[in-house]
Amino acid sequence: MRRSGNGGAAKKKKKRSASAASERRPRADGGMRIVVPLQGVVQGRGGLVLGSLIPCALFYFFQLYIKRNRASPPPPPGSPTAASAAAVSPIHRSLSRGLLAPRAALPAISARGASVRDDDSLYYAGLRRCAADPYHPVTNPSGIIQLGLAENYLSLDLVGRWMEEHAAEAASMAGGEDEDERELSIRGLAAYQPYDGILALKMALAGFMRQIMQGSVSFEPSQVVITSGATPAMEILSFCLADPGNAFLVPSPYYPGWDRDIKWRTGIELIPVPCRSTDNFNISITALEIAYNQAKKRGIKVRGVLISNPNNPTGSFVPKQTLHDLLEFAAEKNIHLISDEVFAGSTYGSGKFVSVAEVVDDLEDFDKGRVHIIYGLSKDLSLAGFRVGVIYSYNESIVTAAAKIARFSSVSTPTQRLLVAMLSDQKFISDYLKVNRERLRKMYHLFVDALDQVGIECYKSSGGFYCWADMSKFIRSYSEKGERKLWDRLLEEAKVNVTPGSSCHCIEPGWFRCCFTTLSEHDIPVLVQRLRTITDSHKPNH
């Protein structure tokens, strides 16, 4: 019995040794992983029949699997079926289906992209709604009348006539009968040029801006950076002046596009500083001081003050004394002053427009390096589609940095050459500015009178393409919500798109920006009729 016990123990030990050896044994290749289990099947309890059939069946399916999945030999060179065989290979089809199959969700959009995607305002919502159903007296008389877009159609005929007469000549510029001259001309158009604008256009723009200011101030071409519109000009300048998390103080109401133009990619905050109707929406230095101190307490670094002159949306000029006060405030706080003057040449009021450049020139011992101007040709020359903007800065470091960033926002050379010719045509420019101002003045008064017919009063404007209309007596609830409901009714029932004051950060409900330069005189009666459907149905709330 003792031997038997020892023998059993020996067998168990031998079995454990064999098992351990099996674990230490290197893995077999692919064929052995199939054959070894088959051996167990043949020797199993199923008998000879099962032990024979099952291995044969498994072996058959294994061979079929290999045959179907191995690559076929390539066709001989020159074979007409070589390309087609590769195109219809089962493996290629299998991979294509696998790549195209919607097995998982798409990669996530960035947080920055998501914030842009989700950001919106009634200003842009109205523009989109109008673009989808624009009014036309013949082709779409029931469409939406556009009063939300600051675009000038009043003088397009003047620009169009000049283009017809001079565009071909301007495009060739240095071209002539000589072959070398023609080659030089095409090189000047097709080759790379400075991203911040060619010198000829900088000189022409400096002269045009001086003409806009009626010769009261001169501009240096070396301080000009040209961009593809005033929007990128504003963004590039902001990028150079402030860091993410910094802020600009902005007297409000202000142009609603700045919330996108400045904040989206730079990460700079805009702090509205309310101006009130009781003060004629004038900028208050006291209010700026309070806003600056509040931002400082919250740990926000204020890097500048941003204004528009003429003001957008009120259409008023910033008084010369206020510009002096703003410069003193900027110097005291050691911050920048940015003046958006894109409507400087689109004036029609009795007052005189004064650029911050004129005020700076009058000051002695003042550091001009904190003063910057935004300009463009979209408004004063009705060339919005040409996409030409200007950064004018007295700060050499800002000019250098902005010129480098302008590579992402450069204007095409043919466009620049064409504009050099146009701006150099002094007779055309003088005639255009004179006629355009007359047409603006006439349409402004027609528009204000039309609104007055339906009981809507307008703040007195001196420049720009719009009037600042007070519709507060037509909102049922004196609140932003009540303003929103009136805006909805104007858009959906009257088919008129306007910009609500809340989009401009106006703290007084019921103000709306109404642009009049996309209208013709024949559109005015239609507008009056549509507005009556809203104003006549409202019982004034005060």
Swiss-Prot record:
GO terms for cellular component: amyloplast membrane. It comes from the Eukaryota. Its cofactor is pyridoxal 5'-phosphate. Disruption phenotype: Enlarged starch grains in endosperm, spherical starch grains in pollen, decreased number of chloroplasts in leaves, enlarged chloroplasts with increased number of starch granules in leaves, reduced number of total panicles and slight reduction of seed weight. The keyword Plastid applies. Catalyzes the formation of 1-aminocyclopropane-1-carboxylate, a direct precursor of ethylene in higher plants. Required for the regulation of starch grain size in endosperm. Keywords: Amyloplast, Ethylene biosynthesis, Lyase, Membrane, Plastid, Pyridoxal phosphate, S-adenosyl-L-methionine. The modification N6-(pyridoxal phosphate)lysine is found at residue 379. Pfam families: Aminotran_1_2. Residues 1-28 are annotated as: Disordered. It catalyses: S-adenosyl-L-methionine = 1-aminocyclopropane-1-carboxylate + S-methyl-5'-thioadenosine + H(+). Belongs to the class-I pyridoxal-phosphate-dependent aminotransferase family. SUPFAM superfamilies: PLP-dependent transferases. Its EC number is 4.4.1.14. Pathway: Alkene biosynthesis; ethylene biosynthesis via S-adenosyl-L-methionine; ethylene from S-adenosyl-L-methionine: step 1/2. This is 1-aminocyclopropane-1-carboxylate synthase 6. It is found in: Plastid, Amyloplast membrane. Expressed in leaves. One of its GO terms (molecular function) is transaminase activity. GO terms for biological process: amino acid metabolic process; ethylene biosynthetic process.
